[in-house]
């Protein structure tokens, strides 16, 4: 354990044989402040867009809401469209990323295009979207413009963040230091973010 309760991020290389090939995987591993050793990608996500969580009961009741999609009309008659997506933040010196399951907002035409791509296996394009969750360990991320990349086979779309000076954009484009990734994961562990999903809109393990 490092001084002052800071979790240790440890190198861990796994070599596997696949046929005639030896494949090396640099796994992320750290000893948490809880005393346990964790290996692999930290995974956390949100059950709903923050904007949807704050809507009154009648709006939620009339919404089209599922595990991966959300569309609703607010009390002013405005329509909103969202999709759940996966943000992979690289961890330096590791092949395991820090993964966030978050919600992005789309315009109507892009939402329709994404729904169509979700059912196909040949999607190869990007859509303009906006993150609609605040990641708790970063400066505000709600409203951050991103690119949404549909994936084949009804898989979650992935998120790309253009280069800018926001801490999340820097982490996405340059990678996050292993020790910092361990500290972030430890904050969720200490907060008891594990097991059954808590209330909608709060981080949960994917």
Please provide the spans of the model-predicted regions.
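Arginine residue identity/basic-tract feature
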Residues: 17-18, 26-31, 67, 79, ...
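Charged, low-complexity interaction segments
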Residues: 63-152
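C-terminal, charged low-complexity interaction regions
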Residues: 117-206
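Basic, glycine-/proline-tolerant helical and adjacent loop/strand elements
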Residues: 11-92, 96
């Amino acid at each position: 354990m490092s001084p002052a309760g800071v979790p240790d991020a440890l190198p861990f290389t796994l070599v596997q044989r696949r046929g005639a090939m030896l494949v090396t995987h640099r796994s992320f591993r750290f000893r948490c402040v809880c005393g346990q050793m964790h290996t692999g990608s930290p995974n956390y996500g949100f059950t709903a867009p923050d904007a949807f969580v704050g809507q009154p009961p009648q709006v939620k009741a009339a919404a089209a809401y599922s595990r991966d999609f959300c569309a609703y009309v607010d009390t002013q008659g405005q329509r909103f469209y969202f999709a759940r997506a996966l943000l992979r933040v690289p961890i330096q010196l590791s092949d395991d990323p820090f993964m966030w399951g978050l919600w992005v907002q789309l315009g109507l035409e892009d939402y329709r295009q994404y729904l169509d791509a979700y059912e196909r296996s040949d999607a190869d394009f990007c859509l303009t979207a906006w993150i609609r969750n605040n990641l708790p360990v970063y400066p505000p991320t709600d409203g951050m413009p991103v690119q949404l990349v549909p994936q084949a086979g009804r898989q979650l779309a992935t998120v790309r963040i253009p280069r800018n000076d926001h801490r999340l954009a820097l982490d996405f484009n340059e990678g996050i230091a292993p020790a910092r990734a361990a500290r972030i994961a430890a904050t969720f562990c200490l907060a008891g973010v594990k097991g059954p999903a808590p209330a909608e809109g709060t981080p949960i393990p994917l």
